[in-house]
Regions:
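Intrinsically disordered, low-complexity regions
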Residues: 6, 22, 57, 96-97
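His/Glu-rich zincin catalytic helix
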Residues: 17-86, 110-113, 119-129
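Acidic/histidine-enriched segments that form metal/cofactor-coordinating
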Residues: 53, 79-80, 87-173
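Intrinsic disorder/low-complexity segments enriched in polar/small residues
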Residues: 3, 17-19, 150
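Hydrophobic side chains within alpha-helical segments
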Residues: 5, 72-75, 145, 152
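A general, composition-driven signal for non-globular sequence regions
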Residues: 10-12, 29, 63, 67, ...
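Sec-dependent N-terminal signal peptides
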Residues: 3-13
Length: 173
């Protein structure tokens, strides 16, 4: 009975949020083909921005596994306009947070920050999409970071190794 009451509460609560227009999504496409979805939340002066690229580990060529995850890391290395660590330091300095993740079908980057910085964050995001600056040094550093992540997440976990083996059979590339 308590479970039914709890479910009814959440259904009522989220229906109210939807009816008040708190989570109404609007979507459109830019001239360059990029799809944009905006979900406005009027409860706080904060923005959550996510950029999803249709490039994940499932589309990597044979012999190039890990490239999507590697690029995810390298995208934080900066540009001429916003050098190494500027992006992350800026978001942290304004009280925001950011991260990224790679899946089989996509790589996603997200930030949460005060809405008054939206224009600046979007400029930085657009800049790193086309002006990423890589050096041999920062490529080598990230390579070591990824190998350590692999050791922690896969090599030291038998179930993760099994999962990886099964996926290599299901998806030969």
């Amino acid at each position: 009975m308590k479970l039914v009451g709890l479910i009814l509460f959440f259904l009522t609560f989220f229906s109210k949020l939807q009816s008040e227009g708190i989570y109404n999504a609007k979507s459109f496409q830019l001239k360059n083909g990029m799809k944009v979805v905006v979900v406005e939340n009027k409860r706080a002066p904060v923005v959550s921005q996510m950029i999803w690229y249709n490039f994940g580990s499932g589309v990597e060529e044979k012999g190039k596994s890990g490239l999507a995850h590697f690029m995810e890391h390298l995208m934080f290395k900066g540009t001429k306009k916003f050098p190494d660590n500027y992006y992350s330091n800026f978001i942290s300095r304004i009280g925001g947070s950011e991260n990224a993740f790679t899946s089989y079908d996509y790589t996603a980057y997200y930030q949460i920050f005060p809405k008054y910085e939206l224009e600046k964050i979007m400029q930085m995001e657009a800049d790193r999409m086309v002006n990423l600056t890589l050096t041999e040094e920062n490529v080598e550093i990230e390579k070591k970071v990824i190998l350590e992540e692999r050791f922690q997440r896969v090599e030291s976990d038998p179930s993760a190794k099994l999962d990886e083996s099964m996926r290599s059979i299901l998806f030969p590339n």
